[in-house]
Curated annotation (Swiss-Prot):
Taxonomic lineage from the root: Bacteria, Bacillati, Cyanobacteriota, Cyanophyceae, Nostocales
Top-level taxon of origin: Bacteria
Key words of the record: Cytoplasm, Gluconeogenesis, Glycolysis, NAD, Nucleotide-binding, Oxidoreductase
Subcellular location, record wording: Cytoplasm
Protein name as it appears in the record: Glyceraldehyde-3-phosphate dehydrogenase 3
Organism: Trichormus variabilis (strain ATCC 29413 / PCC 7937) (Anabaena variabilis)
Length: 337
């Protein structure tokens, strides 16, 4: 038995989530809601992607539908979740990928429209189950949790590293810097923006800005609340990104021990296929289309004065993230059968 899935917001995350999920037997995609461009633009951008290339299935628009290998998905252009007749399409699960609705109050209309579960492709600002696959997905209780967030791409990169180091050595405190690719929250040329640095042209500068990824770790490890913080630096690339982690740990360690812990974790459950480990001298482009959330650059691991640790972790901030979101959707789907 499949569950019926709808997508709200067919931008970067919505389109790539559909690509990553297409063909999984638990998920039947039936509806797309996107306010810009109509079905023609949706079909075209699903098929052709400047970063991730041409998608293998045949994709076309036919009236108010998108056809994928002749399978029809209905299409609408409503501005608010409450305006979409999700119940008419029999939608059980919505992937909320618009980036606009991030509080329980703005997400509650889905449930009033008959949707059983909602997974948000962004952090939710208030109470919602914050899931990082491989780290705390065991917390999901089908009868209790209906609104879930798949956290952020950077949190999905950082959390596996924190899990291994905190459980293996103990983390006193730390500072995180994510070297992050451009996103649509920035501007191509200078334009007004509430963040004056993001107001500047993306292709001409390295742009320091905020990230909540480090503080979000406290939702998973409450004992680290107030002990981790971080910053993002947006760079003029489209893919992939890098997280620079600096921790003070509880006991003396070595580069060899750090790398051994991370390598071992990457080879067994629950982080196998989520955490990677790489000893070759690779660069960011080599991680484009990598479905893992976090890949350790073992050559860059450092230890200073026995307890200060530096770890670099690569991630495809789009493809890695949507693969975890789809894994969460499959977990939810199995709970609804």
């Amino acid at each position: 038995m499949k569950i019926r899935v709808g997508i709200n917001g067919f931008g970067r995350m919505g389109r790539l989530a559909l690509r990553a999920a297409w063909g999984w037997p638990e998920l039947e995609f039936v509806h797309i809601n996107e306010i810009k461009g109509g079905a023609v633009a949706a079909a075209h951008l699903l098929k052709f992607d400047s970063v991730h290339g041409r998608w293998t299935p045949e994709v076309e628009a036919e009236g108010e539908r998108v056809l994928i290998d002749s399978t029809p998905l209905s299409f609408s252009e409503y501005g608010k979740p409450e305006d979409v007749p999700w119940e008419d399409f029999g939608v059980d699960l919505v992937l909320e990928c618009s980036g606009k609705f991030r509080t329980p109050a703005t997400l509650d209309p889905y449930f009033k429209r008959g949707v059983q579960k909602v997974i948000v492709a962004a952090p939710v600002k208030e109470e919602a189950l914050n899931i990082v696959m491989g780290v705390n997905d065991y917390l999901y209780e089908p009868e209790k949790h209906h609104l879930l967030t798949a956290a952020s791409c950077t949190t999905n990169c950082l959390a596996p590293v924190v899990k291994v180091i905190h459980e293996g050595l103990g983390i006193k405190h730390g500072i995180i810097t994510t070297i992050h690719d451009n996103t649509n929250t920035q501007t191509l040329v200078d334009a007004p923006h509430k963040d004056l640095r993001r107001a500047r042209a993306t292709s001409l500068s390295l742009i320091p800005t905020t990230t909540g990824s480090a503080t979000a770790i406290a939702l998973i490890y409450p004992e680290l609340k107030g002990k981790l913080n971080g910053i993002a630096v947006r760079v003029p690339l489209l893919n992939a990104s890098l997280t620079d982690c600096v921790f003070e740990v509880n006991r003396p360690t070595t580069v060899e021990e750090i790398n051994a812990l991370l390598k071992a974790a990457s080879e067994q459950a629950p982080l196998q296929g989520i955490l990677g480990y790489e000893e070759r001298p690779l660069v960011s482009i080599d991680y484009k289309d990598d479905p893992r959330s976090s890949i350790i650059d073992a050559l860059s691991t450092m230890v200073v004065d026995e307890t200060q640790v530096k770890i670099l972790a690569w991630y495809d901030n789009e493809w890695g993230y949507v693969n975890r979101m789809v894994e969460l959707a499959r977990k939810v789907a199995l709970s609804l059968k």
